[in-house]
């Protein structure tokens, strides 16, 4: 039965497992599409326009924002990043789900956008701050200064947990993955996401009349 797609927002402090859960979710269901962001930064070696990012000039990006063509946007280290609305709207209409791996500010903008009714938002918490610190250090890719900055930012990010529809405490990655799948499966079955249900039920009622 046909259904309308949904916008799945996944947010967490750095190190809580958001990116790993996102990858596992799309491996479980390849039909889920990652939102491709637009950016004004220069392409890195191997990056392809339209696949990794939509690369835009600063003027093009600002014009898109002013025209209401971005679901959310922010400036990070002198470069603009944002989520173009048109590809997401097309995916929704075709019944495809779009996954946003974004922070609470981006999630807030999308929830307040014209597509807010299609949003399912999930916040991922660490089991403890000590474990969060351990996970960041286990990556062995950040300096002490970067880790300290990420930990300081985490306190602010965690303070927004109550703005989300669902909250997962990632004590065990496999369990958190299963919980994430259950949330998505249930949300896909919501009555308002199944536009063909009315006709289906009419058909059932018609069968009563022909018995």
Curated annotation (Swiss-Prot):
Domain Guanylate kinase-like: from-to ranges: 5-185
InterPro entries: GK/Ca_channel_bsu, Guanylate_kin-like_dom, Guanylate_kinase, Guanylate_kinase_CS, P-loop_NTPase
Coiled-coil annotated residue ranges, if any: none
Listed GO CC annotations: cytosol
Keyword terms of this UniProt record: ATP-binding, Cytoplasm, Kinase, Nucleotide-binding, Transferase
Leader sequence residues: none
GO terms assigned for molecular function: ATP binding; guanylate kinase activity
Catalyzed chemical reaction(s): GMP + ATP = GDP + ADP
Residues binding ATP, per UniProt: 12-19
Enzyme type, top EC level: transferase
Location relative to the cell: Cytoplasm
Any Pfam family the entry gives: Guanylate_kin
Protein EC: 2.7.4.8
SMART domains: GuKc
Family of the protein in this entry: Belongs to the guanylate kinase family.
Purpose of the protein: Essential for recycling GMP and indirectly, cGMP.
HAMAP family in the cross-refs: Guanylate_kinase (MF_00328)
Protein name: Guanylate kinase
């Amino acid at each position: 039965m046909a259904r309308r797609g949904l916008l799945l927002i996944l947010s967490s402090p750095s190190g809580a497992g958001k990116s790993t859960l996102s990858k596992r979710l799309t491996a479980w269901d390849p039909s889920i599409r990652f939102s491709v962001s637009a950016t004004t930064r220069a392409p890195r070696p191997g990056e392809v326009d339209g696949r990794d990012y939509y690369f835009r000039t600063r003027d093009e990006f600002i014009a898109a924002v002013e025209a209401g063509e971005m679901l959310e946007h922010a400036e990070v280290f002198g470069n603009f990043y944002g989520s173009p609305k048109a590809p997401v709207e097309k995916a929704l209409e075709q019944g495809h789900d779009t996954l946003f791996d974004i922070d609470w500010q981006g999630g807030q903008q999308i929830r307040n956008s014209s597509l807010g009714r299609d949003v399912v938002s999930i916040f991922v918490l660490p089991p403890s701050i000590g474990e969060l610190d351990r996970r960041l250090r286990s990556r062995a890719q950040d300096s002490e200064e970067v880790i300290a900055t990420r930990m300081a930012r985490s306190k602010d990010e965690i303070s927004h947990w109550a703005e989300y529809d669902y909250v997962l405490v990632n004590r065990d990655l496999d369990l958190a993955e299963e919980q994430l799948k259950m949330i998505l499966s249930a949300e896909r079955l919501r009555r308002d996401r199944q536009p063909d249900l009315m006709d289906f039920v009419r058909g059932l009622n018609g069968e009563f009349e022909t018995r």
